[in-house]
């Protein structure tokens, strides 16, 4: 929640205004489309228009950007030299057709982009900008890779640093998402103490009724100890407590960072488990509208209660 997409879109917009040709890529179409939407919004705010193209699959709606300035093309040969912005996965930029055709290549979620893929598509640009957080989930890997060849692009660049050094990049140090009590723990545990919460985030809190579940707090991190044994991938005792907390949450209100009060709904809650067996069990006992999944399903998403 540090404005990665917003800042990236602003930088790309500035380069487009300067007449630079931009490439946008990532491991997934979802990540690419999210950044493209941010770029179009930034351009619309500034009344700036440009022509762009994204390599998509007409038979897969989830790959389509459906933009007002960035059109979808099924054939990469339909990308024109007039397109100041081109977007696609590594398969697009690794094609010799696009060698040295971009001034800048922006790679989103670079913590999940393999070094090999970056090298393959890097020939398309004179400059490469990596965007992401190597402390999030790493790239899925199958097989054995010698030396550092199995690293992600960000892992290779940062050489073990938890946060990017000033001489290698920009660290966005303000979260617009986390309450200060949560941010303090995350910052010290993961980000060298460099991450800080915006002051308005302190307004975010649950407005708990007197009968609320005792495991709930107005804000911050709550730990509930549950005694059980032999539950390596599925825990019914944990499921029972989660069901009670979920039901209690739906009877509460919350205050957002703007000071507005809302009723808690299932949309405001994320339930996360490391095991698919437990996820399936939780889905079977929680209301149908509950958002339940493993970490990889919800990475990058947010909710008032997790």
Which sequence ranges carry the predicted segments?
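Conserved glycine(s) of the Walker
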Residues: 3
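Hydrophobic positions on the alpha1 helix immediately C-terminal to the Walker A/P-loop
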Residues: 7, 11
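Conserved catalytic segments around the Walker B and adjacent sensor/switch elements
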Residues: 21-24, 50-51
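Conserved helicase motor core of SF1/SF2 NTP-dependent helicases
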Residues: 14-19, 26-34, 38, 90-107, ...
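Inter-Walker segment of RecA-like/P-loop motor cores
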Residues: 41-94
